[in-house]
Amino acid sequence: MKLTCKFSTMVALIAVAFATSSCGTKRIVADGSVAKTTTTAQKTQNATADNSSTELKQMNYLRKVADNAVYSKNIVSKIKCTISTGDNNISVGGSLHMRRDEVIRIQLIPFGLMEAGRLEFTKNYVLLVDRIHKEYVKASYSDVDFLKRNGLDFYALQALFWNQLFVPGAQKVTDSSLKSFIADFSASPIKVSTTYGNMSYVWNTDNTTALINSVNAKYSGGKDGNTSVTCTYSNFKALGTKKFPTDIYLTMSTKMVKNASKMSLDLQLNTLSNDDDWETETSISSKYTQVGADEILNKLGGL
C-alpha cells in the first residue's frame, strides 16, 4: 500500500510537471510575450533558489567555525613568552591564566623563580605590573588611547586569545549575529569577514576543519593612519572535546605606538588545563608607583 501511494504521488508530480511544461510550450506558439514572462519568472525562481542555497551554505559554515570554540570556563598553561622589539628579543617563562568573560592574565617568571611582570585584561580595566621597578599601569579601556581608537575592548581581546569569532561591541556570538559575517569560499583558506564602523576583521579558516588559523583586525583612522593587529594560531591540541592552539603569535602595525611595527608577542603554551583554583583579581601593593595610561604600550616599545 505504501509503495503504491508513493508511486501514485510520483506519477502525479511528473504529470503536473509535464502539464506545466506543455502549457508553456503552447504559450510560446500563441503568445511570445507571455513566454518571455514565463522565462523571466523561471529565472527569478532560479536566482531565489541559488541565493537560498548560498545563504544556507554560508550559515552552515559560519556555525561550524563558531562551534569550534572551546567549552572550558578556564584555560591555564605554563608558557614561553617571546617579546620582540626589533633589535631585541626577550624570551622568558611564565604562565597564562584565562577565565571566560572575566580575565586574561600573562605572568612573566624568569627561570620559574620570581614574577617579573604581569599583563592583565579584565572587563573593566587593563593592568600592567612591572615587579622589577615597582611600577604599574591601571586604566579603563576608554583611558588607553590606542585601545579606544581601535575599538578594542575586553571581549575583542578575549576572542583573540581564545581563538574564536567575535562581534564588535557584543559579549558573544549568537546564531542571529552570524548573519553579519561573510564566508568567502573562493579563497583558500576560506576567509570569514565582517566590518564595524572603521574596523574590519578577517579570519582565515581551515577549509576542512573550519579552525581559525589567523585573524587580522584593521582600523582605518584617516589622518591618524591605519592600525593593524594580526594574530596567528598553530599547533592545535585537545582541550576537552575541542582543539586549542598552543602557539599564539601577535604582531601590530601602527603609528600610534613607538616601534609598533617591530613589536611581536609569541606565546607558546606548554601545558593546557582547565584548572579553576586561582584568583581573578590582582592586588597592588602601596609600595608600587602608578604611571600614565598611555605608557602601557610605549614602555614595551622602549625596551
Describe the function of each predicted region:
Residues C81-T85, P110-G112, M252:
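Transmembrane beta-strands of outer-membrane beta-barrel pores
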Residues C5, T25-V29, V173-T289:
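Gly/Pro-enriched, hydrophobic low-complexity segments
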Residues V103-Y155, A159, Q290-A293, N298:
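An acidic-aromatic
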Residues D67-I75, G86-I90, H97-R99, T208, ...:
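Edge/loop elements at the starts and ends of beta-strands within beta-rich repeat scaffolds
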Residues A19-S22:
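C-terminal motif of bacterial Sec signal peptides marking the signal peptidase cleavage site
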Residues M59-Y61, R131-S200:
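Flexible, processing/modification-adjacent segments and terminal tails
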